[in-house]
């Protein structure tokens, strides 16, 4: 008997019909002789609707109350799926994140999981119940308040619960048949991938691939939890995320795919003194604003000798906060101005094969040049090349790179609904 954790996203439980379909799949898994734990997201656009409501009643909703509000979405879908399972003759019991033992930091809106104490879940499993856990939420270790986990929180909940229960696999159900060499909405002949290493999936998630979120993959790699990405709408085998690139023979390594990200912004600090310590002041200020930095470029400044310009990218949602923090410290740090651009996009090529295939960077840049796309900034790792370009050219760039590296398959990928989550 295997212990299977399944996670269903908002599009998979968007209405009553889809909830019943999900319940049937869950019961089938139970009847196959497995213990089953299910993590669900809020139905469809429920979270966005709740956010809109909050902003209608308050220009600045208190973070604690916002978390109390938003967690209602997952509790609703959790209970509805449990009801649907019971109607099929199986036994189900639903738990909120706090009831399931998901212990977090106290940062409302973006809490991190500290621990999972799954005693109540184990008891329910021992009684033969199908266990349901509301995703995206937990309880603060210090204040005991309800917290939310931020973007990708339900995926992270599923992997954390799987690790705590020592599950055999964590199945993440989306609206595509696994992981592809590119977004099928942009590249219809994107090729399905049977397996992907944790490192490759981390790079893909960090570069904008929306099927799995970065925090979820980080957690899975840390606790060696295999992730099985499948579609809620088909019985196709999906993609297994497991193992390390070190386990892949060098000659067998391939290029995994092309990822893109429309959600970044570019910040440029102009006229910074070109002496030791000033770059550190810039990045310390950004860190104090709780903004994560992605790509970084430093150039000789054109405005004055002895000065430098530093450009970095961050999440678009956090860009204004970084600019505000830096602007407040302009005189103290000693730069001329801050420039902000949120009309950018990032496109990346990922794959363990880069380690053994010379010329990848040249082909990458040539493909973009032939498509008439100008590169603003380049960043690389052992298994990734990323460039910053205009956001209006992202789709063209993805298609050009996918074709240049021969990543396409013979069949057209199917997207069943929603946004790939």
Curated annotation (Swiss-Prot):
Reactions catalysed: L-aspartate + ATP = 4-phospho-L-aspartate + ADP
Keyword Metal-binding among UniProt keywords: no
E.C. designation(s): 2.7.2.4
Any one annotated GO CC term: cytosol
CDD domains xrefs: AAK_AKii-LysC-BS (cd04261), ACT_AK-LysC-DapG-like_2 (cd04923), ACT_AKii-LysC-BS-like_1 (cd04913)
Domain named ACT: residues: 267-348, 349-421
Pathway field: Amino-acid biosynthesis; L-lysine biosynthesis via DAP pathway; (S)-tetrahydrodipicolinate from L-aspartate: step 1/4; Amino-acid biosynthesis; L-methionine biosynthesis via de novo pathway; L-homoserine from L-aspartate: step 1/3; Amino-acid biosynthesis; L-threonine biosynthesis; L-threonine from L-aspartate: step 1/5
Annotated residues for binding of ATP: 7-10, 41, 174-175, 180-185, 210
Summary of activators and inhibitors of this protein: Feedback inhibition by lysine and threonine.
GO molecular function, one term: ATP binding
BP GO terms, sorted: diaminopimelate biosynthetic process; homoserine biosynthetic process; lysine biosynthetic process via diaminopimelate; threonine biosynthetic process
Family matches, as NCBIfam families: asp_kin_monofn, asp_kinases, PRK06635.1-1, PRK06635.1-2, PRK06635.1-4
Protein name, UniProt field: Aspartokinase
Organism lineage string: Bacteria, Bacillati, Actinomycetota, Actinomycetes, Mycobacteriales
